């Protein structure tokens, strides 16, 4: 499937036995959420339970931790802010070449399907996927139905397929109950997004359900770094994704660790 040696080698750092736990900490440009100011501390604490970290270039070049951990480094290329007239208008703020210079194992982009600038975002994604092919570096595409489009099985399925058609190597999409229909439309790894911070119980149940329906893992940021117990949550994700454990088993193993 991944026909180039460079991509295959780098993908193996992200995907372990076909599964992955990714920690996105690229939220600081959008809005400085609680915990985002402690990237190094959070990554150092949870490093045993994650396979990859997503950050922007500014964080990567200043980090004292990212160069010394086993987790893969993914540099995020897209950005917009919550203060903008159109927060869904994602713009490219760095290059694949810069990401490689920073030591990236992969790059990621965010595409908002249904937004006013959907066409421009799709065009950029297509160009970036070709550059990634040239350098043998995997592309993770975060594909979201946004704007006036509701998050439904059909819209998420369509968004995922767009990312696949554009040349992405991994897809990150929102959770829907019929996640198996999303997975079925693409023969590349599809990871479920963690979503906004909420109940630990509900969050972990969503992840468990997505894994049971074919998800290749989870990319969860706010539910980890915004938690009062990030290590506990990261460990639970690792047990569900890599250990095929049910949430009830995780709770029993950890002594009813999930309280929310």
From Swiss-Prot:
Enzyme Commission number(s) from the entry: 2.2.1.10
Short name of any one Pfam family annotated for the protein: DeoC
Cystine bridges: none
Gene Ontology terms for molecular function: fructose-bisphosphate aldolase activity; hydro-lyase activity; transketolase or transaldolase activity
Highest taxon, organism lineage: Archaea
Keywords associated with the record: Amino-acid biosynthesis, Aromatic amino acid biosynthesis, Schiff base, Transferase
GO biological process: amino acid biosynthetic process; aromatic amino acid family biosynthetic process
Reaction(s) catalysed by this chain's protein: 1-deoxy-D-threo-hexo-2,5-diulose 6-phosphate + L-aspartate 4-semialdehyde = 2,3-dioxopropyl phosphate + 2-amino-2,3,7-trideoxy-D-lyxo-hept-6-ulosonate
Active-site residues, as the UniProt record annotates them: 26 (proton acceptor), 144 (proton donor), 172 (schiff-base intermediate with substrate)
Binding-site positions, 1-deoxy-D-threo-hexo-2,5-diulose 6-phosphate: 26-30, 144-146, 194-195, 221-222
Subunit structure: Homodecamer.
The family this protein is said to belong to: Belongs to the DeoC/FbaB aldolase family. ADHS subfamily.
Annotated function: Catalyzes a transaldol reaction between 6-deoxy-5-ketofructose 1-phosphate (DKFP) and L-aspartate semialdehyde (ASA) with an elimination of hydroxypyruvaldehyde phosphate to yield 2-amino-3,7-dideoxy-D-threo-hept-6-ulosonate (ADH). Plays a key role in an alternative pathway of the biosynthesis of 3-dehydroquinate (DHQ), which is involved in the canonical pathway for the biosynthesis of aromatic amino acids.
Record's protein name: 2-amino-3,7-dideoxy-D-threo-hept-6-ulosonate synthase 1
Organismal lineage: Archaea, Methanobacteriati, Methanobacteriota, Archaeoglobi, Archaeoglobales
This protein's encoding gene: aroA'
């Amino acid at each position: 499937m991944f026909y180039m040696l460079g991509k295959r080698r780098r993908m193996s750092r992200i995907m372990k036995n076909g599964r992955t736990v990714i920690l996105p900490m690229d939220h600081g440009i959008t809005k400085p959420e609680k915990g985002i100011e402690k990237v190094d501390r959070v990554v150092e604490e949870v490093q045993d339970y994650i396979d990859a970290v997503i950050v922007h270039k500014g964080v990567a070049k200043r980090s004292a931790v990212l160069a010394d951990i086993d987790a893969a480094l993914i540099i995020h290329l897209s950005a917009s802010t919550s203060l903008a007239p159109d927060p869904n208008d994602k713009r490219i703020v760095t290059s694949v070449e810069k990401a490689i210079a920073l030591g990236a194992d992969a790059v990621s982009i965010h595409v908002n399907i249904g937004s006013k600038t959907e066409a421009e975002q799709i065009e950029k994604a297509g160009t970036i996927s070709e550059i990634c092919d040239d350098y043998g570096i995997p592309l993770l595409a975060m594909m979201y139905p946004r704007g006036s489009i509701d998050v439904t099985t059909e819209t998420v399925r369509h968004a995922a397929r767009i990312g696949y058609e554009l040349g992405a190597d991994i897809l990150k999409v929102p959770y829907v109950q019929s996640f198996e229909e999303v997975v079925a439309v693409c023969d590349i790894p599809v990871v479920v997004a963690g979503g906004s911070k909420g109940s630990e119980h509900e969050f972990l149940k969503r992840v468990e359900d997505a894994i049971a329906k074919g998800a290749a893992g989870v990319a969860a940021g706010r539910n980890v770094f915004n938690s009062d117990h990030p290590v506990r949550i990261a460990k639970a994700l690792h047990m569900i994704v890599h250990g095929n454990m049910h949430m009830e088993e995780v709770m029993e193993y950890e002594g009813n660790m999930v309280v929310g």
